[in-house]
């Protein structure tokens, strides 16, 4: 099935050559899934599950952002530094480039807060909480007589639930998404920060090494990262760009470790995937094999 960039997912696996176990889960379901908790601990997870995601207390998920609505990012400092991929920051880097200052070719570094470059159309989105609204959505469609009527009813109530969030608090955004082929519906509540400034980008020869040819063909050796900073008003709240804004102070930070990892280390990723076929039905897999893969090969 397809996921929009609106819900944080967790992927866990063990890097050991001898054994690997993996999966993809909605964060809201993690606490309920005792087997997932047990398996991750067996693989080496030391952090309690409620430290991964907790809508009532600061947690690791608070450091993970939807970057621009099309990528993932992670907050790594108390002053709002965000790491994301080079290709995710590519358009912002390009926007500030010129013949005199070709930041795509040569890279960019801001040596002070004053040198950081604003990006008017860029934002980062923090997930505040998720809520299962399946019963409410499906009840709105129970009297539908056709699939078309059902779709209209479902879409309508999804939009209503989302709008209710911003009506209660204008700084919040509510989005309802369908999961598991429309058998579950989850509301995600976000807060957006619209003042995001470019801090550092490597040259494209590093950040885009191999370009998309290598991306889809080979293991990559790419410095695929860029660094931005979130700015807020003096109350640490969302604000449009202003010279008076100050660096955002996050509720939770994922600090960078210089110790690295070793073979067999537990590995887990939180983020906003563009799409996944992990929960595709057997009929969907059959369709891909017959009509998609056969035509390609």
Task: List each language-model region with its residue ranges.
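Bacterial Sec-dependent N-terminal signal peptides
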Residues: 1-22
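Terminal presequence/propeptide segments associated with secretion/organelle targeting
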Residues: 17-297
